[in-house]
Curated annotation (Swiss-Prot):
It comes from Pelagibacter ubique (strain HTCC1062). This is Phosphoribosylformylglycinamidine synthase subunit PurQ. SMART domains: GATase_5. It catalyses: N(2)-formyl-N(1)-(5-phospho-beta-D-ribosyl)glycinamide + L-glutamine + ATP + H2O = 2-formamido-N(1)-(5-O-phospho-beta-D-ribosyl)acetamidine + L-glutamate + ADP + phosphate + H(+); L-glutamine + H2O = L-glutamate + NH4(+). HAMAP family: PurQ. Part of the phosphoribosylformylglycinamidine synthase complex involved in the purines biosynthetic pathway. Catalyzes the ATP-dependent conversion of formylglycinamide ribonucleotide (FGAR) and glutamine to yield formylglycinamidine ribonucleotide (FGAM) and glutamate. The FGAM synthase complex is composed of three subunits. PurQ produces an ammonia molecule by converting glutamine to glutamate. PurL transfers the ammonia molecule to FGAR to form FGAM in an ATP-dependent manner. It is found in: Cytoplasm. Residues 3-227 form the Glutamine amidotransferase type-1 domain. Keywords: ATP-binding, Cytoplasm, Glutamine amidotransferase, Hydrolase, Ligase, Nucleotide-binding, Purine biosynthesis.
Length: 227
C-alpha cells in the first residue's frame, strides 16, 4: 500500500503521520505543497499543524496550494483522502467536505485526550473494526464544527458523520463535547465515504509507552481494508 503525506508551510504533524503510516505497512512518501503531481498513492493524508500560520482562515491558504489540484482530482476519482486537524480544515476549505470549523466554544486552545465514537462503518476507514470507542488526542483552536440546517440534514440523511465526541462509555452528550461542535461531530465523510476529515490525532496514539494504542487499531484496520 502506497501513501502520501502532504507537507505545507507550518505543518507540524507530517513526520508523526509518516512514522505512523510506515509502522503499519504503508510505503509512504512526503509530498511538498508546491509539487504538482501526486506519486502513486492508495491514500493521501493532509496532516495537522498550522499551515501558513493559520492566516485568513485555518486551511484557507493551504487549500489553494499547487498540490491540491491533484488531491482534488484524486479524491473526485474515488481515491482515499484523510485530513487530520488542520488537514480537516483544509479539506473543508477546498470543498471536499461540507461545513466549516470555527473557534472553539470557549475561545481557548484545547490540548487533551478525548473519547470519540465511530458512527459509520460502511467505509474503508472503520469497516470491520470491532472497536467503537477510541481514545485519541486533540490539539486545536478551531475545531468547532458547524454547518447550515440544510447541510446537517443532508449529512445525517447520508450517514456522513464519521466520529462523535463521547465519554468512555460511548455516551454522546454536551459534557463530552470539548469545543462546541454541532451534534458533537468530531469527523465527517464526503457523500462517497472516500474522504474523511477528523479533528482527533490517531497518529499520536500508536505507542503504549508514550500515549496509547487506539491509533494502532485505527491504522492497522485502515491498511487491512485498503489491501
Amino acid at each position: 500500500m502506497h501513501s502520501s503525506v502532504i507537507t505545507f508551510p507550518g505543518s507540524n504533524c507530517d513526520r508523526d503521520m509518516d512514522v505512523a503510516l510506515k509502522k503499519f505497512g504503508f510505503k509512504n512518501k512526503m509530498v511538498w505543497h508546491d509539487d504538482v503531481e501526486l506519486p502513486k498513492s492508495d491514500l493521501v493524508v493532509l496532516p495537522g499543524g498550522f499551515s501558513y500560520g493559520d492566516y485568513l482562515r485555518c486551511g484557507s491558504m493551504a487549500s489553494k496550494s499547487k498540490i491540491m489540484k491533484s488531491v482534488l482530482n484524486f479524491a473526485q476519482g474515488g481515491g482515499k483522502v484523510m485530513g487530520v486537524c488542520n488537514g480537516f480544515q483544509i479539506l473543508v476549505e477546498s470543498g471536499l467536505l461540507p461545513g466549516v470549523l470555527l473557534r472553539n466554544k470557549y475561545l481557548e486552545f484545547i490540548c487533551k485526550n478525548v473519547f470519540v465514537k465511530a458512527n459509520n462503518k460502511d467505509n474503508s476507514y472503520f469497516k470491520d473494526d470491532k472497536k467503537n470507542i477510541y481514545e485519541f488526542h486533540i490539539a486545536h483552536n478551531e475545531g468547532n464544527y458547524f454547518c447550515s440546517n440544510d447541510q446537517i440534514k443532508e449529512i445525517n440523511d447520508n450517514n456522513q458523520i464519521a466520529l462523535f465526541y463521547s465519554d468512555e462509555n460511548g455516551n454522546v452528550n454536551e459534557q463530552s463535547n470539548p469545543n462546541g461542535s454541532l451534534q458533537n461531530i468530531a469527523g465527517v465523510f464526503n457523500k462517497q465515504k472516500n474522504v474523511l476529515g477528523m479533528m482527533p490525532h490517531p497518529e499520536r496514539m500508536i505507542d503504549p509507552a508514550l500515549s496509547g494504542e487506539d491509533g494502532s487499531i485505527f491504522f492497522q484496520n485502515l491498511i487491512n481494508n485498503l489491501k
